Amino acid sequence: MVVEESAQYQPGFVQLLTGDFNTRYDSKVFTSVRSGGWKESYETIHGEGEAGFTGHAFQGVDYVKGSSKGRIDFIWYRGQVKPVDAAIIKDAINGKYPSDHFFMQADFVIE
């Protein structure tokens, strides 16, 4: 649905697609997203799509991942925009995490 919806805009139109996708980087969902011309910011900057687990059940870096592994939070982009930085933010305040997922961050320039 996202691929079809985004295709209605001119090719250079800047679009961002972000969030907790609850699916791994190598899934069929992302194969479909890529086929629509979307690129993933962390992969573009760091040369790798898999950057470790981003969900942590409010336990942060101490979370035991079990059988689930891999990043499920992404910042996708298309159009005349380019990421210049991307990171996984693992900050806590007084030992408490504001979310059960680490935050994804990306800085872009509009071309």
Model-predicted segments: where are they?
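Metal-dependent phosphoester-hydrolase catalytic domains
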Residues: 4-16, 21-111
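Catalytic-adjacent loop/helix segments of enzymes that bind and process anionic phosphate/sulfate esters
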Residues: 1
